Design a protein with these regions (language model features):
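Small cysteine-rich, disulfide-bonded extracellular modules of the LU/uPAR three-finger superfamily
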Residues: 1-99, 105-142
């Protein structure tokens, strides 16, 4: 009895490119910053994220044609936006910690999220660049 199936790297990249071509470039997604200390999980809902509420902050539309598919590395393929979205809120008086970003689809539903390795501080005259990405892998533990 087989313990599980694994896709070879070449096929994995083909599948990731197909996902990108058939789904990501045909749908609108928005990227949002979140300010609560939360590590994303597969069971998350929008209620798990507290969106940034700084004056001048707004979620940003991801560019449909901006996705690129990298070569496989460690049995995973990274699909990411080529150009980062820059968040530059106005009127900041107190530095704010930003823990990561989440992405919503056209219906406003949570699509995916990523926590930053370390929380980023946004203060007076500062901004945060976010390059949205999806890790397309053989298995969740890969």
């Amino acid at each position: 009895m087989a313990k599980g199936a694994v896709t070879f790297d070449g096929e994995l990249k083909i599948a990731a490119q197909k996902y990108c071509d058939d789904w990501l470039v045909f749908h609108d997604y928005e990227v949002h910053l979140y300010v609560n200390d939360h590590s994303p999980t597969a069971d998350d809902t929008l209620a798990d994220y507290v969106e940034c509420a700084l004056i001048g902050y707004a979620a940003q539309l991801l560019i449909r044609s901006g996705w690129s598919v990298a070569d496989p590395l460690a049995h995973a393929v990274l699909i990411e936006q080529a150009t980062p979205r820059r968040f530059f809120p106005l009127g900041i008086t107190v530095p704010t910690l930003v823990y990561g970003y989440y992405v919503t689809d056209e219906a406003g539903a949570l699509a995916w999220a990523e926590a930053f390795t370390l929380p980023q501080t946004i203060g007076v005259g500062q901004w945060i660049d976010v390059r949205a990405k999806i890790r397309y892998a053989n298995c969740p533990a890969c």
